[in-house]
Structure formats: structure tokens, C-alpha cells
Amino acid sequence: MANYRSLLQILLSNGAVFGDFGSHMITTTEALADAVQAAQAAGAVGIDTEFVWDRTYYPTLGLVQIGYPDGHCELIDAPAIEDWSPFATLMADPNTVKILHDAQQDLTILKRACGAYPKNIFDTQRSCGFVGLSSTISLSELLKTLMKVRLDK
């Protein structure tokens, strides 16, 4: 458990989750390509999605959040993006770690959006099961347990 705690502390140490960080809304394929280039240069990014499941067989992607190790965050306005091929490049890149919590739904909808199978995924929820914590733990509970931080959702 000590190694996992260390990893989580590294991921959270710069205020990316709790501090004051800059964000930028991405609404074009060109801006998405720039964000992907920054993600690849960083070597690791946190990814989360927001989607709507209303009167459809599949969920509709609404927002993709990308967090960088320096604390910066990109918000991708999914309906505004016409060409997801830059994001497909990121998802398929084996040299960039994609960090998600409870990744299954996120990965399913991202695969539908960009068409790429993800490589080099780190799922914080699944990892908990390997270190003696619940493999179904919420992100809020995980942060409370390991970091003694209360996350308002």
C-alpha cells in the first residue's frame, strides 16, 4: 500500500486536484491537437469524461477533462469537436500514461468517440484491489482514505 500511496501523492502533490489551477476550453480540432501534443510531452495525464445517457442506446459524450502533472487542466467540449483523430493518437500512444478512476465507462465512450483502443492505462480504482483496498472504492472515498482529503463532488 505504501507504493500506491506514494503514487497518489505524486499525482496530487502539485494542486492539480485541490489547488487553484488554470483551465482552458477546447472547441476545435486544432486546439485538441495542441492539447494532445502537450499530454504526450508530459508523459502522463489524468482523464475523466462527463456524458449524457438520455433517450439513446449509447451515452453521448459531453465533456472530456484532461489534467496535466503541472496542475493545468483542459476541458474538451466534445460536441464541438468534429475530428477526434488527435485524441485517438493520444489514446493509442503507449508512451503516455492515461490515469483514470473507474475507467470502464470512460474508455468505452472514448473508444466510440475517437475509434482508438487505449494503451498504457492506469485505473486508480482497479489498482486499489491489488493493494488491499476495495476494488469498487469511489474516488472521493479513496482520497479520504489515503490522503485525508474530503472531495466535494
PLM region spans:
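N-terminal accessory regions of nucleic-acid-interacting proteins
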Residues: 3-45, 49
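Active-site-proximal helix-loop-helix substrate-binding element of RNase H-like nuclease domains
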Residues: 11, 18-22, 65-153
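Short, flexible, glycine/charge-rich loop motifs used to bind or transfer phosphoryl groups or to couple energy/partner
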Residues: 34-36, 54, 86-89
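Short, surface-exposed beta-edge/turn micro-motifs
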Residues: 42, 60-61, 95-96
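An N-terminal structural lobe/cap that precedes and organizes the functional/catalytic core
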Residues: 50-69
